[in-house]
Each structure stands twice: as structure tokens, then as C-alpha cells.
């Protein structure tokens, strides 16, 4: 029998219903795996006592035939989802000992359906990063290694801990957040399915904010079916979030294995020209186009003329929103406070924030403060908002002709820890293909579609119309079936 911690969410649900094993046994197998691979630094807070207590309650519910949809299923949560009574830090020194007195809506939704939380996962500080190297708890190491090198690789970011946990069989599923690609890019780097729903589908209540008009909860799983199961549990209108969409949660699981007949897939190949895209990624993109064509889809050449400005636009709008959101961390109400004798209030603010925030967060706060200043507002911020609307219009025009759009999730495979650390511009370009859909608030997923010449996973991205998670899953499922001969599993796990 497959090791319990290697079961998918769907297979775990089936096994628990059939009484092949108990939730306590399932959770125990995951705890052992976490303890075995602590060197990866995927978790920053382990909640094993809570998990075993929840597993015991799940076993009782199964015994009484009262099992809910996710009863007894182990998951992890990125450490920016507030968890009542459990430390939540956003992996920043400024919140290192913060314990919330309320629960985020997304984690509450999963708990209400029987999910069992194993712990909180590492991340880039305040979700600012593409490699999980800005955390105050240290780097996350990917479970994957290249076949020609034993060097430690990044898992992607900012949700790198969640990606490492699921890829390394330390959780069946894990919550992430996606602002400009922070679920899709790590999923691509670690051979997982990473899904970002339509902006507003999942409540942001209790999610520590980075950029409010872009942040959206997402999910990492090892199969497309698992994504559909978790999304059905996570999504839903929430009156506590003013940006929450009042729309019915669709039935998504029937999308798996659906026919591609009459589906039109848009491919903006021009976006790959002159970019930093690696040859392996280009080949994987072309191979996936052929796969979908052979599955019955019609491939349509499209253009997204303003998508190439996405990174520039994002790094004006997101830092602007971050500088506003992070102004609340002043040492007065909660979090870190740095004091010394005879210190003025202004000095206390300055010392607290300069000590509590890391270098990347400070960089983005300074950028954001400048673009919102009187000299930067017209020159940068308002222009960026105009181009954001043009990016969204490009997608609207494309979706008048196609049902989904196909793009790589990242321009490269995973790289070595420290390799690009000192060049923020190169690091920012990692989100070249994910940012446009974020600016437009569209549902999208990364699904494993191939391996590089060095044996590293490569993800393809499917972008759908607003609120059309169903067709994104449908295309993702077809791709998953077409590459099932490839084993997306790190060696030694």
C-alpha cells in the first residue's frame, strides 16, 4: 500500500471512508515526515497537539457516519493566515511573537469541513519575494535536486514553505497566497498544482495584507482533483471582506476528465519572444500546445499587447499598497516595540520599523512611499493604474475569442539558493508570466507539464475568465492526464 503521507486528498478521503486507516494514523504519518525533513525549514510553527486532537474528533465523526467533506484531511497554512491562539508572523521580526485572537475566514472554512492543521509554513517576509529567502526564520530548501548537481534549490516564493511541505509529502494540501504569482511560481518549481482563484472568490479576512487589490488565497496540491476539492471548501462569500464576491460556489470536481471538444485555447507566443524564458520552458510550452490540440482543443493565436508592462506596473502598485498596509506596524498596538531611555515617539517608530522589517520589505515600502508622494503620484502611480486597466482589457478582448489562455508559470526552472539574491530586478522578472493575470484578477493555475534537461519540474499556467475556475480545472486535468507518464516526485522522499 502507498505510504499514508503520499496519498492524495481524494485517496485519503476514500481510505478514511472505507476505514482502511484512521485519521490519527494519517496525521501520524505526516508528523513523522515533518520531523524527518525539518532541515528543509518548511514549517515555522508545528501544531501537532492540535492536529492529533482534530484527528481524534474526525475518527469519531467517521465512526458515527457524520464525516464532513474534508474530515480528517491534513493541511498546512502559510503563516499569513491568522489562526486563533496560534502564532502568526508573516515571517517578519516585527510580528515574530504575535498570537491572533481571531481566525481567518479561509482557515475557518477548512476547519468547518473537517480539515486538520499540521502547522504554519515558512514564507517570504510579508509575502514579498520569489524564492523564500526573505523570511526571518531563514531560507526554505526545495525537496527537489537537479540530476547533475546536489546544490540546494529555492522552492519559489513567496509561498515556498507551503510548496515544500506538499512536494515533500509533509502535507496533503497547503494554503498559500498569490499576489503576483506566489502560488503558481512555487508550484512550477516543485512539481505541484498551484491554484489562484478569481480575486474575491476567497475571503481576505484574517489574511495579513501585502497589496490589498491583488492578494488572493490559493492552494497547493499534488493533483488537479485535489485542487477542485480544496477550492470548493475554501471559496465563498464573506461579509467580513468588502472585496468578497457574492457568487455561488460552483461544483468543480466534475471538471476533472471533461472533454476538450469545442474548447478554444489562446496562446500568446509573442510574450515569449525576447524574454528571459529558458529553452526548456519554451519546449514545454510547445509540447503542451500539441497535447491540448491532440486532446481536441482548438489552438488560437492571441496577443496581450500590454502584458509585457505587467512587471513594471506591479512594482508600482503593489509597493504603494504595501507602504500603506504596513504603516500599521508602529510598535504601539501589537508586534515588536524597540525602546530605550529618553526615546521620543518618532524615534521609537523609526527604531521599531528599521529593526523589525527586513531589507526587501524596506525596499518596497520606500518604493511605495515614493510613488504615492506628490512627485511620484502622477509620474508613476496613476500611470500604472491606467496600464493595469489596459492589461485587463487585453484579457477581455482575448476571452471574447477563447475559453482559456496558456502561458508558462515561470520563465525558468528552480535555481540555486543565493544565485539571484543580490539582483532584485532579475528576481522580480520571475513573475513575468504570472503578474498579468493577477493585475486582471483572473483565476489561474500552474500544473506540472514536463521536466527540464536537469530533471527539474516545469509548470504550465492556465488562465480563465473571471469566475471560471471550472474551465481552468478542465484544461489542467487534460494536461495532467497527458503527462501522467512523468513522475513529479523529488528523489528520497
Swiss-Prot record:
One of its GO terms (molecular function) is ATP binding. It comes from the Bacteria. The keyword Protein biosynthesis applies. The active site is at 78 (charge relay system), 158 (charge relay system), 182 (acyl-ester intermediate). Its EC number is 6.3.5.7. It is an enzyme of class 6 (ligase). It catalyses: L-glutamyl-tRNA(Gln) + L-glutamine + ATP + H2O = L-glutaminyl-tRNA(Gln) + L-glutamate + ADP + phosphate + H(+). GO terms for biological process: translation. Keywords: ATP-binding, Ligase, Nucleotide-binding, Protein biosynthesis. GO terms for cellular component: glutamyl-tRNA(Gln) amidotransferase complex. Allows the formation of correctly charged Gln-tRNA(Gln) through the transamidation of misacylated Glu-tRNA(Gln) in organisms which lack glutaminyl-tRNA synthetase. The reaction takes place in the presence of glutamine and ATP through an activated gamma-phospho-Glu-tRNA(Gln). NCBIfam families: gatA. Heterotrimer of A, B and C subunits. Belongs to the amidase family. GatA subfamily. This is Glutamyl-tRNA(Gln) amidotransferase subunit A. It comes from Rickettsia peacockii (strain Rustic).
Amino acid at each position: 500500500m502507498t505510504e499514508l503521507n503520499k496519498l492524495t486528498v481524494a485517496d485519503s478521503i476514500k481510505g478514511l471512508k472505507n476505514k482502511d486507516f484512521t485519521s490519527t494514523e494519517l496525521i501520524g504519518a505526516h508528523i513523522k515526515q515533518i520531523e524527518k525533513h525539518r532541515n528543509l525549514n518548511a514549517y515555522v510553527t508545528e501544531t501537532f497537539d492540535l492536529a492529533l486532537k482534530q484527528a481524534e474528533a474526525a475518527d469519531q465523526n467517521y465512526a458515527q457516519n457524520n464525516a464532513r467533506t474534508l474530515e480528517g484531511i491534513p493541511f498546512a497554512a502559510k503563516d499569513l493566515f491568522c489562526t486563533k491562539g496560534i502564532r502568526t508572523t508573516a515571517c517578519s521580526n516585527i510580528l515574530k511573537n504575535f498570537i491572533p485572537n481571531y481566525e481567518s475566514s479561509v482557515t475557518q472554512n477548512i476547519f468547518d469541513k473537517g480539515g486538520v492543521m499540521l502547522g504554519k509554513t515558512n514564507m517570504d517576509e510579508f509575502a514579498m519575494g520569489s524564492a523564500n529567502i526573505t523570511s526571518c526564520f531563514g531560507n526554505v530548501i526545495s525537496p527537489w535536486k537537479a540530476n547533475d548537481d546536489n546544490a540546494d534549490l529555492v522552492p519559489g516564493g513567496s509561498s515556498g514553505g507551503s510548496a515544500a511541505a506538499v512536494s515533500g509529502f509533509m502535507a496533503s494540501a497547503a494554503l498559500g497566497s498569490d499576489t503576483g504569482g506566489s502560488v503558481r511560481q512555487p508550484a512550477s518549481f516543485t512539481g505541484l498544482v498551484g491554484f489562484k482563484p478569481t480575486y474575491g472568490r476567497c475571503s481576505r479576512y484574517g489574511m495579513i495584507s501585502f497589496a490589498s487589490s491583488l492578494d488572493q488565497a490559493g492552494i497547493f496540491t499534488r493533483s488537479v482533483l485535489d485542487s477542485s476539492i480544496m477550492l470548493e471548501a475554501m471559496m465563498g462569500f464573506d461579509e467580513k471582506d468588502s472585496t468578497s464576491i457574492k457568487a455561488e460556489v460552483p461544483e468543480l470536481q466534475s471538471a476533472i476528465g471533461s472533454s476538450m471538444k469545442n474548447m478554444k485555447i489562446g496562446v500568446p507566443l509573442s510574450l515569449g519572444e525576447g524574454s528571459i524564458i529558458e529553452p526548456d520552458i519554451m519546449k514545454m510550452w510547445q509540447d503542451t500546445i500539441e497535447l491540448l490540440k491532440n486532446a481536441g482543443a482548438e489552438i488560437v493565436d492571441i496577443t496581450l499587447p500590454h502584458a509585457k508592462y505587467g512587471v513594471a506596473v506591479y512594482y508600482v502598485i503593489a509597493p504603494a499598497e504595501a507602504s500603506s498596509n504596513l504603516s500599521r506596524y508602529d510598535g504601539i498596538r501589537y508586534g515588536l516595540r524597540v525602546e530605550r531611555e529618553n526615546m521620543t515617539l518618532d524615534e521609537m517608530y523609526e527604531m521599531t520599523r528599521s529593526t523589525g522589517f527586513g531589507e526587501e520589505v524596506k525596499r518596497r515600502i520606500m518604493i511605495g512611499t515614493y510613488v504615492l508622494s506628490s512627485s511620484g503620484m502622477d509620474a508613476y502611480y496613476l500611470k500604472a493604474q491606467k496600464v493595469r486597466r489596459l492589461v485587463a482589457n487585453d484579457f477581455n478582448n482575448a476571452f471574447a475569442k477563447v475559453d482559456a489562455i496558456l502561458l508558462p508559470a515561470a520563465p525558468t526552472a528552480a535555481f540555486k539558493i543565493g544565485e539571484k539574491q543580490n539582483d532584485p530586478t532579475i528576481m522580480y522578472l520571475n513573475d513575468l508570466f504570472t503578474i498579468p493575470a493577477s493585475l486582471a484578477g483572473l483565476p489561474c493555475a500552474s500544473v506540472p507539464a514536463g521536466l527540464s534537461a536537469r530533471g527539474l519540474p516545469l509548470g504550465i499556467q492556465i488562465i480563465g475568465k473571471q469566475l471560471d475556475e471550472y474551465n481552468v480545472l478542465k484544461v489542467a486535468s487534460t494536461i495532467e492526464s497527458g503527462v501522467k507518464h512523468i513522475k513529479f516526485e523529488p528523489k528520497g522522499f
